[in-house]
Amino acid sequence: MVSPLDDILVIEIDNWMASPSAGAILADLGARVIKIEPPSGDPMRNMGRAPKIDSPLKTFDFQFDVDNRGKESLVVDLTQPEGTAIVQHLCSKAQIFMCNLLLERQQKYHLDPETLFAINPTLVHATLTGYGTTGPDAWRP
């Protein structure tokens, strides 16, 4: 079956709700989405578990699985130069890079729009943060 986003590669660095949900929709539409996670894993992996219920599902994290359905996961340590190089290499081949990192963090890891556009001028660089990029709460993640 042909999907609308076949042949689209998305590199995603994010956690919590909005941005992972957007990535899941892109995967639903046929994009190949590679989720980059830190060595400690996405903090959402353990947020939705219900360990107090007596069920085989008590270790199943529904929210994480819903928000990350259809994605591949790759562990990358962005605090190391090799980690940044891996993500930049992936972005050189991707059509979309999406993240919910504040601009300062994007710059720290050399994943800001200017740096990635120099590597891939046709890349769509999408930032989705909880409080936007301007205004009094823009500094909040």
Where are these regions (language model features)?
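N-terminal helix-loop segment corresponding to the beta1-alpha1 unit
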Residues: 1-141
